């Protein structure tokens, strides 16, 4: 488990990384950043609330990208999930 501040840093890095990802490409550095974000979101899941819902959505969206070809729809879904995750993390500080 990581602190909220560390999780927020990872979330912001994922937001920057996802912007570099294009449909039908998989860049190793981008995927490594997304994997780290996915891990942080999943490891910090607890019993409920808006933050945990955001973590779950990020986990699903990032897994979809990491385990298949990134499509525009998957990338857009991940961007939206990351934005919601960041918003909830910032609200938890």
Regions flagged by a language model, labelled:
Residues 2, 25, 45-46, 62-63, ...:
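Intrinsically disordered, low-complexity segments enriched in Ser/Pro/Gly/Ala and basic residues
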Residues 19-31, 42-52, 66-75:
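Charged, low-complexity interaction regions
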